[in-house]
Amino acid sequence: MSEQTGKVDDSQSPPKVQKKLRKGDLVKVDREKYSNSLESKASDTNLPEYIFQGPGEVLLIKGDYCQVRWRRPVPDVWINSDHIVSY
C-alpha cells in the first residue's frame, strides 16, 4: 500500500486463481478457452450451444478432466477442467 496515496499497488498482488471445481458444481464451457485448445482442433467444429450456455453438473473429476452431465437427454462428456467455468 502506498503511503502517499493510500491506494493498493495491484502489480505486487498474486494472480487471481480460478476456484477449484468440485463434484456437484454447476458449470459451462468457456467458448474462447475451448476454441483455442488442442481438443477443439481434434473434435467436431459444430458443437451444441447448450454446452456454452450451461448449466452442466460435474459428476467426477480425474486429473485435469471433469465428467459433466447436461440437463438434456445426451451422454455425459469428459471436458478439460481448464475449459469450464462456474455457472
UniProtKB/Swiss-Prot annotation:
Keyword set includes Thylakoid = yes
For molecular function, the Gene Ontology terms on record are:
oxidoreductase activity, acting on NAD(P)H, quinone or similar compound as acceptor; quinone binding
According to the record, the residues making up region (Disordered) are 1-23
**Catalytic activity of the protein:** a plastoquinone + NADH + (n+1) H(+)(in) = a plastoquinol + NAD(+) + n H(+)(out); a plastoquinone + NADPH + (n+1) H(+)(in) = a plastoquinol + NADP(+) + n H(+)(out)
- Keyword Ribosomal protein listed? The answer is no
Q: What class of enzyme is it?
A: translocase
Localization in the cell: Cellular thylakoid membrane
- What are the EC numbers? 7.1.1.-
Q: Name one GO cellular component term.
A: plasma membrane-derived thylakoid membrane
Coiled-coil parts of chain: none
A Pfam entry, by short name = NdhO
Q: Which InterPro entries match?
A: NdhO
Q: Where do Basic and acidic residues bias regions lie?
A: 1-10
Q: Which region is the signal sequence?
A: none
Report keywords, A-Z: Membrane, NAD, NADP, Plastoquinone, Quinone, Thylakoid, Translocase, Transport
Q: How does it sit in the membrane?
A: Peripheral membrane protein
The similarity comment for this entry is:
Belongs to the complex I NdhO subunit family.
Q: Which HAMAP family match?
A: NDH1_NDH1O
Explain the purpose of this protein. Answer: NDH-1 shuttles electrons from an unknown electron donor, via FMN and iron-sulfur (Fe-S) centers, to quinones in the respiratory and/or the photosynthetic chain. The immediate electron acceptor for the enzyme in this species is believed to be plastoquinone. Couples the redox reaction to proton translocation, and thus conserves the redox energy in a proton gradient. Cyanobacterial NDH-1 also plays a role in inorganic carbon-concentration.
What quaternary arrangement does the UniProt entry report? NDH-1 can be composed of about 15 different subunits; different subcomplexes with different compositions have been identified which probably have different functions.
What name does the UniProt record give this protein? Answer: NAD(P)H-quinone oxidoreductase subunit O
Organism, by scientific name, is Prochlorococcus marinus (strain NATL2A)
